[in-house]
C-alpha cells in the first residue's frame, strides 16, 4: 500500500482496479497521496469561481436530479434569458472577488436570438477572458460565434458514468454529451466538465467517470454533491457521508493528477464542518456565492477559510 502511494506521487498512472482500492484506505493515507499530487501540480494556489443562472426553469430534459426540469415538481423560479447588461454588470462585480465567472442557462440549448444577445455582450465585456459558458447542446456555428466573441471556456458536465447515465436521464444520451465536449475541444475551447455524486451510482461508476474525463483531457473538473431538493425524483436518496465525499475527491486527484478540481454544488450542505478538508483531499478550487437554484456560502467566509489554511487565492486566472 505504501509503495503504491509513493509510486503514484512519483507519477504512476493508476488502473481502475487500483483506484477502487483507495476507497478502503484510511483517510490520512489517501489524503497524503492527494495532497502531495495537488502541491506538485498546483502548489498552494486556490482557484475561486462563481456563476449566474442566466435563464431558469422550464427545461424539457428529464434529468432526475434537476430542480429546473419540467419533469420534477419544484418551486424553482422560472424566467427567460436575463438582460445581458445585467449579466455584464453582475459578472463584472463578481470578478472583483473571484478569478472566473460562468454564465449558465437552463434547457437543452439556447435559440439563435439568445446566442446573438450573449455574443454581443461578450464582445463588449472588458473581462471576457475570465468568462465561461454552460448553455447546453451547441452547434458548430454557435461554437464559432462564441469563439469570435472572445469566450475561451466551455462547461458541459458528464454528470456520471456512461453505464449509470440512463438511470438519471432518458431525453438525451451520454454520447451526445461526450460529442459536445469533443467538438468544443475541436474549436479550441478549454473544457470544464465534471459530475454530480450521490445519485445512487457505485464507486466503480465514479471511477469510470474520472477515467472518461481523463481521456477527454478536461482542464477543469467541477465536483458536485447531490442536494436533496423537495420535488425532485432523487429527493429521498440517502446523503453521502462526508468522509466518502472526501475520499471521492482524493481518488479523482489521484487518477486525474493535473486538472483543476473544483468543489461546487452541495459543498456546504454535505460536508458541513469538514468543508476545509477538500484541499487536503486534493481539490485546488471551489465555487462560492451560490449555485443555480440553491444558496451557497458568501465569498468573505470562503476567502477567510482559504487564508486560515495558509493557502492563496489565485487572482485573475484567465483561459
UniProtKB/Swiss-Prot annotation:
One of its GO terms (biological process) is biotin biosynthetic process. It holds the Pfam family Radical_SAM. Its EC number is 2.8.1.6. Gene3D superfamilies: Aldolase class I. Binds 1 [4Fe-4S] cluster. The cluster is coordinated with 3 cysteines and an exchangeable S-adenosyl-L-methionine. Binds 1 [2Fe-2S] cluster. The cluster is coordinated with 3 cysteines and 1 arginine. One of its GO terms (molecular function) is 4 iron, 4 sulfur cluster binding. Residues 41-267 form the Radical SAM core domain. Pathway: Cofactor biosynthesis; biotin biosynthesis; biotin from 7,8-diaminononanoate: step 2/2. CDD domains: Radical_SAM (cd01335). [2Fe-2S] cluster binds at residue 192. SUPFAM superfamilies: Radical SAM enzymes. It catalyses: (4R,5S)-dethiobiotin + (sulfur carrier)-SH + 2 reduced [2Fe-2S]-[ferredoxin] + 2 S-adenosyl-L-methionine = (sulfur carrier)-H + biotin + 2 5'-deoxyadenosine + 2 L-methionine + 2 oxidized [2Fe-2S]-[ferredoxin]. Keywords: 2Fe-2S, 4Fe-4S, Biotin biosynthesis, Iron, Iron-sulfur, Metal-binding, S-adenosyl-L-methionine, Transferase. Its cofactor is [4Fe-4S] cluster; [2Fe-2S] cluster. [4Fe-4S] cluster binds at residues 59, 63, 66. Belongs to the radical SAM superfamily. Biotin synthase family. HAMAP family: BioB. Catalyzes the conversion of dethiobiotin (DTB) to biotin by the insertion of a sulfur atom into dethiobiotin via a radical-based mechanism. Homodimer. This is Biotin synthase. It comes from Endomicrobium trichonymphae. The lineage of its organism: Bacteria, Pseudomonadati, Elusimicrobiota, Endomicrobiia, Endomicrobiales.
Amino acid at each position: 500500500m505504501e509503495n503504491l502511494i509513493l509510486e503514484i506521487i512519483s507519477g504512476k498512472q493508476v488502473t481502475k482496479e487500483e483506484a477502487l482500492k483507495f476507497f478502503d484506505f484510511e483517510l490520512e493515507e489517501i489524503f497524503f497521496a492527494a495532497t502531495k499530487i495537488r502541491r506538485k501540480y498546483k502548489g498552494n494556489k486556490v482557484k475561486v469561481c462563481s456563476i449566474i443562472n442566466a435563464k431558469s426553469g422550464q427545461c424539457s430534459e428529464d434529468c432526475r436530479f434537476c430542480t429546473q426540469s419540467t419533469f420534477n415538481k419544484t418551486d424553482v423560479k422560472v424566467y427567460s434569458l436575463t438582460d445581458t447588461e445585467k449579466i455584464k454588470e453582475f459578472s463584472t462585480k463578481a470578478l472583483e472577488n473571484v478569478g472566473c465567472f460562468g454564465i449558465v442557462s437552463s434547457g437543452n440549448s439556447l435559440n439563435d436570438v439568445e446566442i446573438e444577445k450573449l455574443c454581443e455582450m461578450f464582445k463588449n465585456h472588458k473581462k471576457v477572458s475570465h468568462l465561461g459558458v454552460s448553455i447546453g447542446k451547441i452547434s458548430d456555428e454557435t461554437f464559432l460565434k462564441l469563439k469570435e466573441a472572445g469566450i475561451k471556456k466551455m462547461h458541459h458536465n458528464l454528470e456520471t458514468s456512461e453505464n449509470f447515465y440512463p438511470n438519471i436521464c432518458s431525453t438525451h444520451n451520454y454520447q451526445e454529451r461526450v460529442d459536445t465536449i469533443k467538438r468544443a475541444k475541436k474549436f479550441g475551447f478549454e473544457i470544464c466538465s465534471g459530475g454530480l455524486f450521490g445519485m445512487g451510482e457505485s464507486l466503480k461508476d465514479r471511477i469510470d467517470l474520472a477515467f472518461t474525463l481523463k481521456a477527454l483531457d478536461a482542464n477543469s473538473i467541477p465536483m458536485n454533491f447531490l442536494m436533496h431538493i423537495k420535488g425532485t425524483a432523487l429527493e429521498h436518496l440517502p446523503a453521502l457521508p462526508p468522509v466518502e465525499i472526501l475520499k471521492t475527491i482524493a481518488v479523482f486527484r489521484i487518477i486525474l493528477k493535473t486538472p483543476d478540481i473544483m468543489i461546487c454544488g452541495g459543498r456546504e450542505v454535505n460536508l458541513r464542518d469538514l468543508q476545509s478538508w477538500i484541499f487536503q483531499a486534493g481539490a485546488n478550487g471551489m465555487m462560492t456565492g451560490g449555485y443555480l437554484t440553491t444558496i451557497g456560502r458568501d465569498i468573505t467566509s470562503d476567502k477567510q477559510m482559504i487564508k486560515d489554511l495558509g493557502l492563496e487565492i489565485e487572482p485573475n486566472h484567465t483561459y
